[in-house]
Regions:
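Amphipathic alpha-helical segments within well-ordered protein domains
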Residues: 6-7
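Cofactor-centric catalytic regions
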Residues: 11-13, 17-117, 129-249
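Proline-centric
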Residues: 119-121
Length: 249
């Protein structure tokens, strides 16, 4: 409806519709009706791609034919999600989140945690939390929950990885920067002094006696809202007797 109104306004102003759109395009820093400002945006880039396309520049001959252009965006806001993750003595990671699983979300969470830490997928146990045990988590809907919860899980996993690295350094008596954490195998190693290595599971079994249990906690994650833009160009032909509209291109 907005795009139809833009075309009507362009007609009243006797202006090319795409020129009107370009003159009024929202750009980075534009104030939005809700009080926030537009961040990085592909709005103008999409407009340029439309007007520079061979389709837009081609001739459309013949009666009862017309060309329509419409632009649109989708707010890809993935929300905020709280995550708690704890390393057990047996090397398993207990992952507690607040987003409801309606189709594979826990599998995604476990995959992200396992990939960052270099442990097996089945060594991560995803669980639901509630308002007594976990921070705020957005609703599960649309296309944003997976990316939003993945960002939170990734940051929690990185906290665990860093703390495991620090613990290994303390056990070996070396500087943290001298410990390498292999995210493909979950093995920590150092070549300072005597070459030594330790698996994620081995260190997990020693955590209580070497400084306490290791965990990760994230309140928000790193996925922020942004809009994705797109444009369509369509050529149609209308039958004046029946009103049937045929898409030509």
């Amino acid at each position: 409806a907005i795009e139809s109104l833009m075309d009507e306004l362009a007609e009243k102003l006797d202006m090319e519709p795409m020129v009107l759109r370009e003159k009024n395009a929202a750009v980075e820093g534009t104030q939005r009706p809700n009080g926030t400002k537009v961040g990085v945006t592909g709005n103008e880039a999409v407009m340029r791609a439309v007007v520079e396309s061979p389709h837009y520049r081609s001739e459309l001959a013949g009666p009862w034919r017309g060309r329509g252009v419409a632009l649109g965006f989708w707010g890809a806001n993935s929300g905020v999600h709280a995550v708690n993750a704890t390393v057990n003595n047996d090397g398993r990671v207990i992952l507690t989140t607040g987003a409801v699983d309606i189709g594979g979300l826990r599998a995604v969470e476990a995959q992200v945690m396992a990939e960052v830490l270099g442990i097996a997928y089945d060594e991560v146990t995803p669980r639901y939390g509630d308002t007594d045990g976990i921070g705020y988590s957005g609703l599960t809907a649309g296309s944003g929950t997976g990316s939003g919860i993945s960002a939170s899980v990734m940051h929690a996993a990185e906290q665990i990885r860093d703390r495991m690295t620090e613990r290994a350094a303390a056990i070996w008596g070396v500087d943290v920067k001298d410990v390498n954490y292999d995210s493909k195998t979950g093995v920590m190693s150092t070549t300072v002094g005597e070459a030594r290595s330790m698996t994620f599971k081995e260190l997990a079994g020693r955590q209580q006696a070497t400084g306490g249990y290791i965990s990760g906690h994230v309140d928000l994650g790193g996925a922020t809202g942004a809009a994705t833009y797109g444009g369509h160009i369509v050529d149609v032909e209308v039958d004046p007797e029946t009103g049937k509209t045929t898409i030509l291109r």
